UniProtKB/Swiss-Prot annotation:
InterPro entries: Homing_endonucl, Intein_endonuc_central, Sporu_reg_WhiA_N_dom, Sporulation_regulator_WhiA, Sporulation_regulator_WhiA_C, WhiA_LAGLIDADG_dom. GO terms for molecular function: DNA binding; endonuclease activity. GO terms for biological process: cell division; regulation of sporulation. Involved in cell division and chromosome segregation. The gene is whiA. Keywords: Cell cycle, Cell division, DNA-binding. The keyword Cell cycle applies. It comes from the Bacteria. Residues 278-311 bind DNA. Belongs to the WhiA family. It comes from Halothermothrix orenii (strain H 168 / OCM 544 / DSM 9562). This is Probable cell division protein WhiA.
Amino acid sequence: MSFTDQVKHEVSRLESNNKMCQLAELSALIMMNGSIQIINKNLAVKVRLYHGDLARKVYKLIKERFELNIEIMVRRRNHFSTYQNIYDLFLPPQPGIEVFLKKVGVLDEDHNLLFRIKKELVTSKSCQKSYVRGAFLGGGSVNNPRGEYHLEFRCEHESFAEDLLMLLKRFGLEGHLTEHRKKYVVYFKSFSEVATILNIIGAHKALLKLEDNKVLKEVKNGVNRRVNCETANLDKTVKAAMLQLEDIELIEKTRGLETLSNSLQEIAIIRKKYPYASLKELGKLLDPPLSKSGVNHRLRRIKSIANEIRGER
């Protein structure tokens, strides 16, 4: 089950006791997934849904609030090599259907189609949340939290998408609107925005999963940064050691290590014996032990002698 399906499965089971909020959620679902049909000059409505829990919820809301007749058709389709149920809820022409369409904001009082959010449905904060939940259930999707953060709403009409974006901005969100494949997409791409929307729609289990994955990402990124830093330091240490060994080899071949002072002879012999040791490790091998800066000072003196030899040749 995809993360989107998990979220929709979770929030499909949420029910509001507020009748206006129920209407707000139903309105958003129909605006996202509904279509108007005309049969013998009479209006009919079809709502296409892809989750059984959601189909039952919409059926129950319409039945309880409007007492309309609803026909349910279920069929299966092959979707990306998996079979998926499609639930078509069909409201045939009948008395009360125009009242229903006006209540959910599909028709205005003059029987014109509306492609905007009905303001009366989103006056309270709780109804605004219900509307966003309905919009997500109808046309929302969210990326797996292990990947990049992305949550979107795919809308049929630009004016409705603009209204939805403005509604989401009331929650302090800054989304974006774009057109893609004849749909108008309202989308968000940051952790905080995705987390806020999951909280708005009541997907608290999904929100916990999102937060858990964020922690894992941060730990993984921290480990990677540390490994990269340690690798870079190791490369630097090895490169410096190779140059030091070249200096020591040059002195040994031309003048002999015995020409060096005792302290320089000691560090030259230790470096040859432990070519990949760090300066700190070399210092601990000396007798008596020497600080990192002391080791570095001796190796710089060896480099100066080697450079003198190079200048003579």
